[in-house]
């Protein structure tokens, strides 16, 4: 399973390069297509693990003026 991440930046917030570095440090990789980043679980995560990942993304982006959307899919 993979979790896709779409980010929306504010012009008054952190630069995209900083956001990308933070997300890559959190285990996400840049993604070509309709999403900006992808997290590859390598297996089906539990609901708790999915919620923990969302919490980590929120904590990582806190104070950076970034909105985000997560979506998981089997692929």
Map each language-model feature to its residues.
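Long, contiguous binding/interaction regions
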Residues: 1-4, 10-75
């Amino acid at each position: 399973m993979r979790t896709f991440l779409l980010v929306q930046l504010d012009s008054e917030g952190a630069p995209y390069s900083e956001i990308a570095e933070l997300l890559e440090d959190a285990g996400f990789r840049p993604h070509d297509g309709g999403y900006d980043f992808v997290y590859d679980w390598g297996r089906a995560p539990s609901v708790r693990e999915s919620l923990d990942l969302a919490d980590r993304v929120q904590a990582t982006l806190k104070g950076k003026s970034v909105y985000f959307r997560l979506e998981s899919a089997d692929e």
